[in-house]
Every structure is written in structure tokens, then in C-alpha cells.
A protein has these predicted regions:
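Active-site neighborhood of HAD-like aspartate-dependent phosphohydrolases
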Residues: 1-51
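Short glycine-rich anion-binding loops that position phosphate/pyrophosphate groups of nucleotides
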Residues: 14, 57, 133
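Substrate-recognition element of Asp-dependent hydrolases with the DxDx(T/V) motif
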Residues: 36, 40-73, 86-96, 139
């Protein structure tokens, strides 16, 4: 089997504008980040699978149901599909941060490893885009060598990323220069 490269995206703070300390609990509260459509289309054009990996402990806290989260993701996918930018896979960990026995919570590589197995992905030729240390650490733990950190207010950057951006507005431009070099 020939493995495909992929770009893994965190959701809140990367795909959509961060809700700050809160949660995106409804589709009306979900607002795409500037430049994300162009970035996703570019990944696809260059032959990279696009996969969403997101921690959504709002479900674990009882602030929303799994059904509501699924509906938000379905609406997101519909909007992305209209832009030829839909994700090929969505992986969400709904465990609480302190939940004992959770294997999917970032920085665990579980969501990435599951996506790689289910979609035939080459992690050595892949990239992670995230805004938290745990996103970058998850990529390192999964063996993904290339990472892009989107700097967002209030998220200290202590785990080194290979590239750091001030916002998603320049993500497509950055991906255009990086992706051809990691295949």
C-alpha cells in the first residue's frame, strides 16, 4: 500500500477562531479563521490528506452532547465542502483533561495514529498545524517531524515547533513553501 502524506489541523484557534477560555457549543458560535479555506484547498491540490484532530472536553463536562458536537462538525464539513476544502477525517477526543485511563487526549498521539491507520497516511511526510504546546507535542509523539504553531493570545509556547506564525492569514503562503519540501 502506498502511504499518503497528510496535514493535521487542530480545530479551535486554527480552523476556527478560538473561543478563548470557553467552548464552541453551537454552530452559530463557530467562525472560520481567516485564510483557512485557502490553506485546506492548497493541501488537497498538493496531494495531502487533511485531517482534523481536536480535543472537545465540553462534551465530557456536560456542556454539550456528542450529538451537538457531531452536528457542529457536520455543518463545518458542509461549509468546507462548498469551498472544496472538506476534511477527509475528523477525530475528536471528548474526555476530560484529568480523566483517568483516557488514551486520546492530547498530547497522546492516539488520534493521529488512528487516522494514519484508517486513511493510509505517511506520518514522516506529514505536518501538524496547532496553537497549543499539546498540539505540537502530539505531533512529536506521533513521529511527525514538521509542525506549524499559530500563536494565539494566552497560549505560551514552550514546545518547539519547526515554524511559527502570527496568525492563520499567512498559513496558505507558508504551506505553499513547506509542503513540497517534506514529501
Amino acid at each position: 500500500m502506498i502511504l499518503r502524506p497528510a496535514v493535521f489541523f487542530d480545530r479551535d484557534g486554527v480552523v476556527n477562531i478560538s473561543p478563548g477560555a470557553g467552548y464552541v457549543l453551537t454552530w452559530d458560535a463557530f467562525h472560520f479563521s481567516p485564510g483557512i479555506f485557502e490553506a485546506l484547498r492548497l493541501c488537497k491540490k498538493l496531494g495531502f490528506a487533511t485531517v482534523l484532530v481536536t480535543s472537545q472536553q465540553g462534551v465530557g463536562k456536560g456542556l454539550m452532547t456528542q450529538t451537538t458536537l457531531d452536528q457542529i462538525h457536520a455543518e463545518m464539513q458542509r461549509a468546507l465542502a462548498q469551498e472544496n476544502a472538506a476534511f477527509e477525517g475528523i477525530y475528536a477526543c471528548t474526555c476530560l483533561a484529568e480523566e483517568p485511563g483516557c488514551k486520546c487526549r492530547k498530547p497522546s498521539p492516539e488520534m493521529i495514529l488512528r487516522a494514519a491507520e484508517e486513511h493510509g497516511l505517511d506520518l514522516n511526510a506529514s505536518l501538524m498545524v496547532g496553537d497549543y504546546d499539546r498540539d505540537i507535542q502530539m505531533a512529536h509523539n506521533a513521529g511527525i517531524p514538521t509542525t506549524i504553531r499559530i500563536l494565539t493570545e494566552g497560549h505560551p509556547a514552550t514546545v518547539p515547533a519547526t515554524h511559527t506564525l502570527s496568525g492563520t492569514e499567512i498559513l496558505a503562503e507558508t504551506l505553499r513553501s513547506i509542503l513540497p519540501t517534506i514529501r
